[in-house]
């Protein structure tokens, strides 16, 4: 979630001051001396203690001091960057803030983006006590197909694996749905399995066959350098090519910049209307700038009014947030009463002795000076959002039935949107708990901090937000009104079970049930 209006200024200034990292002398296996690591760790702790407004929101000061001391005590020998990052990740996860996370140095991130490294071969969908194959990188594997329940990996059950990995994964409060979704996304599970348990050349997999019988199989690690099938597919099916019978691929003209942008916009936000059922489906995967969302919302709700749409399904399952001003625009087309974004929104300081480690620290301090004022409690409050009420739009306001699809990737500004509408008589939240907290979060201005020796980075949110003091501060996300949970069968068949549940609710409502 970002600071409205000022975020474009931040982006432009970051662009002007950005610099590239030289890769000439980079070695991924480089080890840093204990003295270097301890220096970085002291900066890491000092910055968080000085700046983070929610360091003790969910974890007591005594407990955080214990975790800080524990991490420091683990630096007894030289370490590689991934080893040091693992220590930092464990400590920062105890803050219970989903916007505060560790990032590799720019050099190491570039290495990971370009290196073809070995990976755990299964992409898994996680939920409590369950792992199910969502994809298999070893394409020739005919046993562990999509939808296969996994009982164990090298003798470790789903519960044992998540108990091992979860302490290193950041989340808002005590939310576990976001952690399950994180492990289910991309190569996150593979990466943390490698760091904490280590890769082996083969993995012993316990799985359930189609009859529900527990069986065992052994699978090799996935090595992209030896995947001749994918290499051949990559040559023949790469963008801008077409295969015309035997022989090498024939290159066609690649799509132009405008065509690529149109495709990106379509994948990021789109509206589809089913005139037969008077139902519209709005997919929205971000609230970031750069996707013309204001114009998209204006056009979309104009279409809904023109076509007399009665049911609107809004899919924000993959929406990790963005600018709160844009989520507010969408909210105003749907909400039936005036609302505020914040009961309280504040930073704890404008300057500290650690400013030199904060990327563009002067700029962020300047923006904090402009946006906030000091109150008697000693905090720097963003008074506009604490006082201002937003009202529903009159033109093209949608008053039909609204179904909002949510899940573990629904985060930050998306939770402001869903939370503001939860409980409204014509709004139903369908799916899973959001990954972001219902009570509030810590975000708005989020610079990176770069540690001086290793150049490891971490995100430092500057403002604590409490949306509504009347909400329970239980560390959980926004709960769905109608749960729609995953199953091995749905994953195996590639079913969109949340959209299907929303359609069923529309049918029941239309028939008066």
Report residues per predicted region.
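Generic N-terminal initiation segments characterized by hydrophobic and/or small/turn-forming residues
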Residues: 1-5, 11-13, 34, 264, ...
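Bacterial Sec-dependent N-terminal signal peptides
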Residues: 1-27, 44
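Flexible, low-complexity junctional segments that flank or bridge functional domains
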Residues: 20-312, 316-346, 438, 443-450, ...
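Conserved acidic, small-residue-rich alpha-beta core segments centered on
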Residues: 148, 324-491
